[in-house]
C-alpha cells in the first residue's frame, strides 16, 4: 500500500504544474494534500479511481487539506477537538480497516513566533487526539507538520535556531509525540541520512543549493513499524515549494 503526502502550496497552481501527471506516475493508494488553498468547486479536474474528501478553511484561499483515496474509508471526519481548531481546514481523519489515517497541516508559528502560544495548544491537543485514536487501532499521521525535529533535518540549524519551525518549543513537542508511542518512519529507516529535505524557500536559490528543511512526515504508531516497507522523500518532484513524501506499507 502506497501513501503520499504533499503540501501543494495551492492546488489550483499545482494543477498547472503537472499535478495530474504526478498522480498517474505515483500510483498511490492514498494521496494526502496540505495547503490546498481552495474549495472543491473552484477547480474541475479528472482523477479517476479516487474518492475525494476536502476540508477547506473558513478564510478563502488559505490553508486546507484533502484526501484522495482508492479505497472507500469506513468513516471520514474533519478537524478535531475544541472549537478553536475547527476553522482552518487543517485535519482530515480517514478510518480504514487496519488503521486511522490523519492528514494534517500544522499551524505555522509565524515570524517572531507570534503564533507560538496557539501552536503549543495545537500540539498538545493533536497529540491527545492521536493517542485516543491509537487506543482503538494504529495511526498513520502525515502532513506538513511545520517542524524540523533535529539538526540533521535542516541545512542550516545554527542560523535558524529559534526561527519558526526550529524553535526549542516546537522541537520539544515533536519529541513528546514520538515518546508517546509513535515513530518518525523516515528517521527510523534512515537515522543518519543527511541532505534529505522536503521544503525549500523560494528565495536565495535554496532548492538549487538543497538548502532545505524536512518538515513533512509520515509518523506511525510504533506497532505499525513491522509493516513499513519504505519511507521516502521525492525531491525531484516540483510544482510546489515542498516535495512529496511517501510511505509504503505491507498488507496486513
Regions found by a protein language model. Give the residues of each.
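Metal-dependent phosphoesterases centered on the DNase I-like endonuclease/exonuclease/phosphatase
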Residues: 30, 51, 122-211, 215
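N-terminal, active-site-proximal structural segment of metallo-dependent hydrolase catalytic domains
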Residues: 1-47, 51, 57-63, 78
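Active-site-proximal beta-strand elements of phosphoester/diester hydrolases
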Residues: 1-9, 98-110, 142
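Surface-exposed cleft-lining segments at the edges of enzyme active sites
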Residues: 81-82, 107-123, 158-162
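Conserved beta strand-loop-helix elements of the APE1-like EEP
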Residues: 60-75, 204-226
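Active-site beta-strand/loop signature of hydrolases that rely on acidic residues for catalysis
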Residues: 7, 23-41, 101, 130-151, ...
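Surface polyanion/phosphate-binding segment centered on an Asp-His-Pro turn
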Residues: 232-252
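Structured beta-strand-rich core segments of catalytic domains in phosphoester-bond hydrolases
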Residues: 37, 43-109
Amino acid at each position: 500500500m502506497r501513501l503520499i503526502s504533499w503540501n501543494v502550496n495551492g492546488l489550483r497552481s499545482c494543477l498547472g504544474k503537472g499535478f495530474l501527471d504526478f498522480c498517474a506516475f505515483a500510483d498511490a493508494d492514498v494521496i494526502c494534500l496540505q495547503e490546498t488553498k481552495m474549495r472543491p468547486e473552484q477547480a474541475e479536474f479528472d482523477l479517476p479511481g479516487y474518492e475525494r474528501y476536502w476540508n477547506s478553511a473558513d478564510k478563502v484561499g488559505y490553508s486546507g487539506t484533502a484526501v484522495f483515496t482508492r479505497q472507500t474509508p469506513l468513516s471520514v471526519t474533519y478537524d478535531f477537538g475544541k472549537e478553536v481548531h475547527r476553522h482552518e481546514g487543517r485535519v482530515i481523519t480517514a478510518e480504514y480497516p487496519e488503521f486511522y489515517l490523519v492528514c494534517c497541516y500544522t499551524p505555522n508559528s509565524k515570524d517572531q513566533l507570534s503564533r507560538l502560544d496557539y501552536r503549543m495548544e495545537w500540539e498538545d491537543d493533536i497529540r491527545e487526539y492521536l493517542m485516543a485514536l491509537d487506543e482503538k487501532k494504529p495511526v498513520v499521521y502525515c502532513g506538513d507538520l511545520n517542524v524540523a525535529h533535529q539538526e540533521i533535518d535542516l541545512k542550516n540549524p545554527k542560523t535558524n535556531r529559534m526561527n519558526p519551525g526550529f524553535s526549542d518549543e516546537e522541537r520539544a513537542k515533536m519529541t513528546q509525540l514520538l515518546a508517546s508511542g509513535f515513530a518518525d518512519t523516515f528517521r527510523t529507516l534512515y537515522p543518519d541520512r543527511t541532505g534529505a529535505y522536503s521544503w525549500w524557500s523560494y528565495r536565495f536559490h535554496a532548492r538549487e543549493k538543497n538548502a532545505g528543511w524536512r518538515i513533512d512526515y509520515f509518523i506511525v504508531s510504533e506497532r505499525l513499524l513491522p509493516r513499513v516497507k519504505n519511507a521516502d522523500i521525492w525531491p525531484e518532484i516540483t510544482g510546489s515549494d515542498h516535495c512529496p513524501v511517501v510511505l509504503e506499507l505491507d498488507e496486513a
